[in-house]
């Protein structure tokens, strides 16, 4: 009937109806009131081809997203821009029109959920009444049409902020019904035998609700090995992934550790929570909400399939959740700094539990935004050769202060600083005594700006008359002005626990995580401060021989810990004594703080030895030495900088001799070597005088 009525219209009347329709309604199965709202502006399109089609629509072939105007349909091959008036852009050839649409409309658009809000020059902004009451058109100008509330925004930056405010309020549904109701298919990624669905633009946090970063794979594997090592101490563990996003980390815990863990995945974003639940069903895991299993999980599984485990998914603020419930393991991975969640994490964490903190605000931690580091962490830092370890000690100091405020101490299990993140994992020790011992390990660092020698300040509250005396170098006496700077406060104790790292290595071998085994081995060498040649990997058949070294998990101390947790009582005197003995042993074998970069301290006009040979030379000289994961060319050693340079010069060959033998260079006297080292230090100081911090 509608087609017959349309055919009865005269051609002139039909053309007038088409001109009056500025926006064409989208055909849908919705009711009539909903169809009245299903209108969107023609400047909002999915692809550039859809925008180009608007200018090439012929009569009788109207697209649902077209806006037809009599000016757009010119005779011949000339076409007018559908988003510009005739006065602004005259009709032109098709290739010029395509270039115009691409450069002046599509490239300056604002993207939201697969749609592009292109810039519009049509007189579609609301008119303004004057004093008399007559309506006058506003000044012709470019503007955007909001995809959510249909508002018109002039500037692109204002449009971005406008859409961002909608997202912060949770208003992500458009006020119209899209032309194609089918959503773009979600991509399925696989990592560690775990499948996850990800949204489009999943690697760009500004363009998606559920952020998934493939570059954080090492971080997720380190956290998994940490939890697997903790699961051997006591079972079951209450685990929390406070910022789930796609839920990949919690899914790996539940899928590979099974009944040893009770996983809770939390996220504040509703879309992320929905995606986490879908990923749970994808991996055959039941979703538990308020201690009740969702009936949907049983319907999705096919015949013969069984659920692997249960996961509790919550939607609330991470601080609120950590105040309401107690956990054995908490992982914090917010977008940016994590200092806003540390107090809540230590509020209800159980004794001997583990808190892992991932910080991605590397611009402030790596001394690129020093004012932000002062604001977030309350410390003063500068860019040094050991800036990555400096960042790790800054985060540990913030964690230690948060734990001390809750009458808890910490034991650092390991700290990793890589290109994209800083990961710190600590064990929680309850009691004011542990809190006081932890607070004493937060100290200031004295850093020489000329030679980059460094040392932690001595304990005590008395003001020292000349703090430069604490530095091993004599730059203050030979250089003018103030040569040192005070950094911190920082964590001054050890960053690694050798026994726990060996247990993590065993778990990585057990679960087949080959990507992080090299990193964990480097951490073990670094914690013991020994060359790699002195380390050997033991097979599972030799685990009984390695019980005292921490590879085998069920030791005597672990049995005492299990009994204590089962009884739910305070620590016995025997356990406190064993803990004190263990701390004394750890202090005696504590690795030296910080490291030296061999390239940074190279001698001008000399060829350096290979790094492996140089480590052997330092070890033969009686110093503890190892490589470090913080810097591929870094050397962790307890040798002072003067001795470090002396040995480096001793085994370096001059460049001008054309390969002089090492025996001739080694025959130089110690006095001559020392003089040459001092001369090289002075030359570098004069050359770098213009780059003082």
UniProtKB/Swiss-Prot annotation:
Motif (Nucleolar localization signal): 95-99
Residues bearing the modification Phosphoserine: 572, 667
Compartmental location: Nucleus, Nucleolus
GO cellular component, one term: nucleus
UniProt-listed Enzyme Commission number(s): 2.1.1.-
Binding residues for S-adenosyl-L-methionine: 220, 267, 317-318
Reaction catalysed by this enzyme: guanosine(27) in tRNA(Tyr) + 2 S-adenosyl-L-methionine = N(2)-dimethylguanosine(27) in tRNA(Tyr) + 2 S-adenosyl-L-homocysteine + 2 H(+)
Keywords carried by this UniProt record: Isopeptide bond, Metal-binding, Methyltransferase, Nucleus, Phosphoprotein, RNA-binding, S-adenosyl-L-methionine, Transferase, tRNA processing, tRNA-binding, Ubl conjugation, Zinc, Zinc-finger
GO biological process: tRNA N2-guanine methylation
Trm1 methyltransferase domain span: 187-648
UniProt cross-link Glycyl lysine isopeptide (Lys-Gly) (interchain with G-Cter in SUMO2), position: 545
UniProt xrefs under Pfam families: TRM (PF02005)
Zinc finger boundaries on the chain: C2H2-type: 144-166
Family membership noted in the UniProt record: Belongs to the class I-like SAM-binding methyltransferase superfamily. Trm1 family.
PANTHER family, sorted: N 2 ,N 2 -DIMETHYLGUANOSINE TRNA METHYLTRANSFERASE, TRMT1-LIKE PROTEIN
Protein name: tRNA (guanine(27)-N(2))-dimethyltransferase
Gene this chain is encoded by: TRMT1L
């Amino acid at each position: 009937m509608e087609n017959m009525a349309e055919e009865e219209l005269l051609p002139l009347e039909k053309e007038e109806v088409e001109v009056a329709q500025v926006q064409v309604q989208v055909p849908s199965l919705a009711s009539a009131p909903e169809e009245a709202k299903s209108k969107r502006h023609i400047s909002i399109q999915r692809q550039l081809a859809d925008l180009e089609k608007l200018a090439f629509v012929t009569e009788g072939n109207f697209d649902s997203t077209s806006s037809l105007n009599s000016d757009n349909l010119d005779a011949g091959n000339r076409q007018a821009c559908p988003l510009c008036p005739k006065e602004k852009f005259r009709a032109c050839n098709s290739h010029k029109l395509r270039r115009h649409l691409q450069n002046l409309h599509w490239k300056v658009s604002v993207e939201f959920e697969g749609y592009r809000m292109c810039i519009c020059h049509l007189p579609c902004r609301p008119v303004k009444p004057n004093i008399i009451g007559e309506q006058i058109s506003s000044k012709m100008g470019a503007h955007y049409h909001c995809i959510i509330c249909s508002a018109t925004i002039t500037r692109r930056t204002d449009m971005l902020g406008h859409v961002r405010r909608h997202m912060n309020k949770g208003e992500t549904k458009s006020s119209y019904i899209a032309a194609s109701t089918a959503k773009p298919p979600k991509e399925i990624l696989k990592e560690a035998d775990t499948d996850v669905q990800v949204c489009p633009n999943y690697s760009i946090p500004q363009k998606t609700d559920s952020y998934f970063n493939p570059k954080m794979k090492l971080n997720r594997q380190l956290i998994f090995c940490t939890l697997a090592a903790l699961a051997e101490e006591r079972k079951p563990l209450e685990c929390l992934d406070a910022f789930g996003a796609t839920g990949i980390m919690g899914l790996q815990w539940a899928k590979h550790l099974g009944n040893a863990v009770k996983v809770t995945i939390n996220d504040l974003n509703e879309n992320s929570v929905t995606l986490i639940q879908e990923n749970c069903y994808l991996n055959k895991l039941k979703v538990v909400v308020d201690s009740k299993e969702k009936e949907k999980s049983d319907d999705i599984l096919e015949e013969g399939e069984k659920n692997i485990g249960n996961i509790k998914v919550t939607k609330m603020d991470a601080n609120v959740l950590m105040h309401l419930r107690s956990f054995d393991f908490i992982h914090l991975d917010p977008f940016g700094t994590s200092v806003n969640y540390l107090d809540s994490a230590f509020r209800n964490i159980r004794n001997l539990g583990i808190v892992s903190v991932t910080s991605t605000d590397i611009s402030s931690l790596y001394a690129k935004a020093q004012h932000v580091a002062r604001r977030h962490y309350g410390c003063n830092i500068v860019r040094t050769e050991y800036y990555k370890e400096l960042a790790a000690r800054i985060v540990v100091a913030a964690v230690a202060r948060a734990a001390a405020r809750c009458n808890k101490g910490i034991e650092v299990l390991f700290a990793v600083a890589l290109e994209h993140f800083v990961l710190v994992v600590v064990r929680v020790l309850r009691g004011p005594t542990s809190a006081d011992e932890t607070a004493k390990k937060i100290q200031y660092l004295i850093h020489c700006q000329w030679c980059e020698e460094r040392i932690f300040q001595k304990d005590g509250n008395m003001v020292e008359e000349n703090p430069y005396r604490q530095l091993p170098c004599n730059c203050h006496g030979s250089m003018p002005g103030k040569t040192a700077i005070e950094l911190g406060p920082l964590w001054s104790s050890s960053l690694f626990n050798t026994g726990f790292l060996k247990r993590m290595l065993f778990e990585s071998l057990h679960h087949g995580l080959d990507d992080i085994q090299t990193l964990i081995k480097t951490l073990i060498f670094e914690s013991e401060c020994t060359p790699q040649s002195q380390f050997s990997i033991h097979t599972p058949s030799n685990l009984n021989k390695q019980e005292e070294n921490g590879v085998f998990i069920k030791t005597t101390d672990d049995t005492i810990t299990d009994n204590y947790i089962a009884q739910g009582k305070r620590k016995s005197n025997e356990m406190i004594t064993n803990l004190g003995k263990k701390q004394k042993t750890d202090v005696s074998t504590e690795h030296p703080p910080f490291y030296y970069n061999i390239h940074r301290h190279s001698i001008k006009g000399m060829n350096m030895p290979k790094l492996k040979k140089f480590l052997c030379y330092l070890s033969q000289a009686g110093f503890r030495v190892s490589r470090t994961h913080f810097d591929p060319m870094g050397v962790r050693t307890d040798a002072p900088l003067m001795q470090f340079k002396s040995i480096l010069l001793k085994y370096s060959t001059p460049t001008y001799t054309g390969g002089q033998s090492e025996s001739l260079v080694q025959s130089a006297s110690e006095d001559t070597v020392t003089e040459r080292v001092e001369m090289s230090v002075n030359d570098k100081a004069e050359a770098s005088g213009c780059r003082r911090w």
